[in-house]
Amino acid sequence: AQWLQDRWTEATGRTDPFEYNSENIGILSDMLASEALVALDNDSNAIGWYDRKIKAAKEVMSLVEPRIMQSPESEAVFDFVLAVTSNGQAVVDNFEMATDMFRFYQRKGRLPESKKEFDKGGERNAAMLEAFKFHNAFSASEQNRALREFLDEDFTVKELNAFADDFNSQIGFDAIKVPSAEGADVLVKGSYVLGPKIGQGFYQNIRGNYDPLTMDIWWMRMWNRAIGRPFVDGLDDTAKNDRR
């Protein structure tokens, strides 16, 4: 990281990170676009790599558990639990937990709601259980669309909050919790309720929609390297809101 920072200082002539302004946004856009073009020149197979790997992983999983690809409904359940159990987990652990949760659903027609039923995931266990409770509540409610349709539907954050308030009042508890990471007029998918990274990003990518960006730890490391703060923690929520 220090070597990269030294290269960054030499290339930019700066010692302080880029400030957040329109001029620097343009500079960073050009910088990252140039990196992407170099990567594509070195390996043109990078185009569509993620899509190919996701599809290949599902093909392998269908050998382990054939019911996953048995119907659009069963695939949607697996995609949901794969996204939810990715939270802070290694890839192998993620797929193992997702398979366990899929089989739990096949046996019981619902996902687990207590630590007695599901105690994996470490410190992310509570967040996973909250997502499972949401899945169960929505699936059991008499909505005019399937859960997978809701998760792929477009909303503004304001509209999604209104839907959540109405839904939660109908079922008597806060099954849907809309994150505050985006402004009220920002367009998101219903899956945003699972979180900006897990729901708006990774879940959509698993489902084949690659327009949303999954800003995981690797993306953040790239971004911090580009702006010149590889050793500094990211902005807190207050600073993020000030910049919207």
Spans of features found by a protein language model:
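HhH-family (HhH-GPD) DNA N-glycosylase catalytic core used in base-excision repair
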Residues: 1-244
